[in-house]
Amino acid sequence: MNNREKEILAILRRNPLIQQNEIADMLQISRSRVAAHIMDLMRKGRIKGKGYILTEQEYCVVVGTINMDIRGMADIRYPQSASHPGTIHCSAGGVGRNIAHNLALLGRDVHLLSVIGDDFYGEMLLEETRRAGVNVSGCVRLHGQSTSTYLAIANRDDQTVLAINDTHLLEQLTPQLLNGSRDLLRHAGVVLADCNLTAEALEWVFTLADEIPVFVDTVSEFKAGKIKHWLAHIHTLKPTLPELEILWGQAITSDADRNTAVNALHQQGVQQLFVYLPDESVYCSEKDGEQFLLTAPAHTTVDSFGADDGFMAGLVYSFLEGYSFRDSARFAVACAAISRASGSLNNPTLSADNALSLVPMV
């Protein structure tokens, strides 16, 4: 913030109901300049909205994908090249967007930095994400471009047999485009990035975040390698076993290998590691601290798709709330369980209270 913005914030703290013309008189500037400064403070996340409600709660900035998710489920076990009966479902998606949505459901103040096209999908995604409680003022609309789309096909056993991720638009989320939100990021309590970002955008995040804890979702083994040289800048990492192999650089064939790989990443600077395992259990490891395995609580399962996004949101929420490492892991596992209990990518019943009610079962 510049000095003028700090002066305006100080005035608003003393009198949140003050009029813009009164602020202008106090600072001996025009009312239009006051309005412009207030708009800038809203964009930077220092003012939540109308009424000059100041943001005192630490907020999270999520930098990552927003896309339309199209998911088809065939009625057979082994889909072939022919047309098959089944169901097709479209929903707002994207790793970054899903995590931001879940954080809003948990009650946190969250900002999403991403890019959309100027098409129907883009407009729908922005509106749905805004309605969820996510601040989308940092999402940039690019004219003449199509919004990112994710297409997945599953069999009748709910196993994904093919997925296509058209996120080329994210290549245009450059540091130059992101610079408009640099002050917002610098004041965040936590920054979360997903590995759909370009190497240049990830570098921008890690460099600008500096001392702010950065959480990273590796997304897939095809994209995990982007952060291999940034491990010293990562506070919390949530890889799968194949993604952990990429980051470690060796095959993992046993629990001992997994533990060695985790410790190797700790030595490079990662503070917290949560390895998402195929059976939906999680191996949790804190640098110079605890290491343990958590299993999913007994809970209704409707669709596992997106549960890991619920898990990551739980990690961010519990970190901002000051939970211990073990309690943070337990809370995140509970969030993932609630996410699996819905056919939607973001279970509308996800809340901090509902997650805490499951924690004793974990």
From Swiss-Prot:
The keyword Transferase applies. PROSITE patterns: PFKB_KINASES_1, PFKB_KINASES_2. SUPFAM superfamilies: Ribokinase-like, Winged helix' DNA-binding domain. Signal peptide: none annotated. It is an enzyme of class 2 (transferase). GO terms for molecular function: kinase activity. Keywords: Kinase, Transferase. Pfam families: HTH_24, PfkB. The keyword Amino-acid biosynthesis does not apply. Its EC number is 2.7.1.-. Belongs to the carbohydrate kinase PfkB family. This is Uncharacterized sugar kinase YeiI. It comes from Escherichia coli (strain K12). The gene is yeiI.
